[in-house]
A protein has these predicted regions:
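Short, well-formed alpha-helical segments that are part of the catalytic scaffolds
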Residues: 16-33
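Short beta-strand/loop segment that forms part of the nucleotide-sugar
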Residues: 36-48, 68-71
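A conserved acidic beta->alpha catalytic loop
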Residues: 43-55, 106
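Acidic donor-binding/catalytic loop of UDP-sugar-dependent glycosyltransferases
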Residues: 52, 95-97, 102-118
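Conserved donor nucleotide-binding strand/loop of the catalytic core
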Residues: 55-93
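Conserved donor NDP-sugar-binding/catalytic core segment of glycosyltransferases
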Residues: 111-141
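Short, flexible, basic/aromatic active-site loop/helix in glycosyltransferases
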Residues: 140-160, 232-233
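Acidic donor-binding loop at a coil-to-helix junction in glycosyltransferase catalytic cores
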Residues: 185-191
Length: 235
């Protein structure tokens, strides 16, 4: 009998006390949508936070996951730490553990884990989804249109984007590819390239979509917030 998949959700969080609760509630809703035979775990990495991020996370996850403290100040290192803790907590086979990655300023849909599970069950080793922006209030009025025009999605529903905020990978493939590296930015593209080079079966689909914050100032240098901010300015 095939061992059911275990879903481990990993979320790095740095000074995210304002948005973290929204993220955790959405993740919990997604966990509740999983089939009863599928186990899940939630690991939040409070990375070099100076606000109440750790406490917000701890108050939420008690009994439903764990919170890890990190002083790395590096998103790649924080993600890697979260995965290590996830794999310490799951004793089953690595090829039956799915690592679902998102960010603390995101809101995932109720079917987010279900949808990744469906790809895992059909033999995929990794999934790359897209992001949409929750609000452009911090930006000039035309930024929304500029972003949506530039954010390419192919007619068949595939896309060229890679976001750590919406990346799933089977644990054995993750380990074979070398895992998250200690990168301050573009750690997601780096891992995805190594998964591709390793010939792991992967898919990039727009049907996997999470909402992310539209803030101008993000946590990672040259991250998504910087991409959005660059759309401001003279037309």
């Amino acid at each position: 009998m095939t061992t059911p998949f275990h879903m481990a959700i990993v979320i790095p969080a740095r000074d995210e006390q304002e948005l973290l609760s929204r993220c955790l509630r959405s993740v919990q809703n997604a966990r509740l949508m999983l089939p009863s035979h599928v186990t899940s775990d939630l690991i939040v990495v409070a990375d070099q936070s100076t606000d109440d991020t750790y406490q917000v996370a701890w108050d939420f996850v008690q009994g439903n996951g764990t919170v890890v403290e990190s002083q790395a100040g590096c998103v790649g290192a924080a993600r890697a730490l979260g995965v290590r803790r996830a794999l310490e907590r799951y004793r089953g086979p690595r090829n039956r553990c799915w690592l679902a990655n998102t960010d603390a300023d995101c809101h995932v849909p109720a079917t987010w884990l279900q949808d990744q599970l469906a790809f895992a069950n059909t033999g995929y080793s990794a999934t790359a989804g897209i992001v949409d922006v929750d609000s452009f209030a911090e930006h000039e009025p035309f930024v929304s249109d500029r972003f949506r025009l530039a954010y390419l999605i192919h007619a068949d529903g595939t896309h060229p984007h890679v976001h750590g905020a919406n990346l799933g990978v089977r644990a054995d493939a993750y380990l074979q590819a070398g895992g998250w590296q200690n990168l301050y930015t573009a750690e997601d593209h780096d891992l995805w390239r190594r998964l591709q080079r390793g010939r792991h079966k992967h898919i990039s689909v727009a049907s996997l979509c999470v909402l992310t914050s539209g803030r101008k100032a993000g946590r990672a240098p040259l991250g998504f917030a910087g991409t959005l901010a660059a759309y401001n300015g003279a037309a």
